[in-house]
Amino acid sequence: MTDLRFRTYTGVSKVVGPLMVLDGVEGIGYGEIAEITLPGGEVRIGQVLETTTTRAMVQVFRGTRDLDTEKTQVRFRGEPMKISLSSDMLGRTFDGSARPIDGGGPVIPECIRDIYGSPINPSAREHPRDSIQTGISSIDGMNTLVRGQKLPIFSGAGLPHNLLASQIARQAKVTGQAEKFAVVFAAMGITYEESAFFIREFEESGALERTVLFLNLADDPAIERIITPRLALTTAEYLAFDKGMHVLVVLTDLTNYCEALREIAAAREEVPGRRGYPGYIYTDLASLYERAGRIRGREGSITQIPILTMPDDDITHPVPDLTGYITEGQIVLSRDLHRKGIYPPVDVLPCLSRLMQGGIGPGRTRADHAEVKNQLYSAYARGIRLKSLVAVMGEEGLTPLDKLYIRFCDRFENDFIRQASYEDRSFDDTLTLAWDLLSILPKAELKRISTEFIKMYYHGEEILECKGP
């Protein structure tokens, strides 16, 4: 019996880049999935981007190369794009269209979901709380990641954001709930070398067992990058809200995703916005970022770390600029620190985690965490200002206290920010190291820390006696 939802047409009116246009069609819905069969028998998947009463424009996820406009058959399936979901996806590796590439069989679905998901009702959202430990001091100590938060990393071409992304995904953990934690990692527009690096990192560290990998390669059709993050987020929603897991979603590189959006907009001859990006890029990015969060009455959570490269290191570029309006802070990587050989090159001064206060303190990290963080920011900022002054005027006018701040600044970069790519520091390790650095300064300078904590952790006299000013 023929399924009336399926309508098949032969021939394509026009092909433009990754898009094809069909005329003479009826009853086609926006977002509907199409099966495109080439004359040689190859089947590709497409999705309706635009429709009228007699015309449909379809984006083809594997590209339009070798597509015959006369003999190609297009079957519309009458439903949006969906993904088969199962808890058995943990430990598996998929391409950017959710096809297995690890040699394993297809996923036996426990359920099938629309990849565009359902928006979380604002009244049902629960405020993000409790932390995720990444093992990286510049994040855990200064910009703590909170469950349910979306905290992007702003990087630049040539900076080690891929290494940082793999380290976060390997080391991230929820204290005391290891069995309920999972990572969904989606990479868009990466090279074969980068793909092999991610797979090797997860396999050798054993982190693959709790990870779902989606890898879209640079030579895959750019149009596929539109669906890769949505496949990842739908998987995360299933693990979080159906299975009660705390899920960390790492998306890299969102700039490649936005380039794919720009390519589609150009093919559709849309009026361009800033720098040629479509005018709806803000809304489109929000449809990804706002899928993070917690739902009242549900155990799980979705935390996002989107990673994007800033063209020419320009933080006012539309992609990082609009991302900053939607997300709850940012981690900024510094080319100056990278030139000094410091990894990870996190420039803590422009960094911010707006929800940090909900994830630190007694019973979560440590009671002194907030005050230590504030004092570190203050001391490091003063050290940076003094180093800028020294570069212009020399060290002759510096007081002994100024020299202590410069010493603190150097130690902060080399001991606190710098760490090995396989060095996993606990919150306690990070805060203990912070007190070692703050003890370089006189006790009277720690004006942002209460006397109670200074009595408990400060040991400046011993350090000054051993090492001098």
Swiss-Prot record:
Localization per record: Cell membrane
Top-rank taxon: Archaea
Keyword terms, alphabetized: ATP synthesis, Cell membrane, Hydrogen ion transport, Ion transport, Membrane, Transport
GO biological process: proton motive force-driven plasma membrane ATP synthesis
Family: Belongs to the ATPase alpha/beta chains family.
NCBIfam families: PRK04196.1 (NF003235)
HAMAP family: ATP_synth_B_arch
Protein name stated in the entry: A-type ATP synthase subunit B 3
Organism in which the protein naturally occurs: Methanospirillum hungatei JF-1 (strain ATCC 27890 / DSM 864 / NBRC 100397 / JF-1)
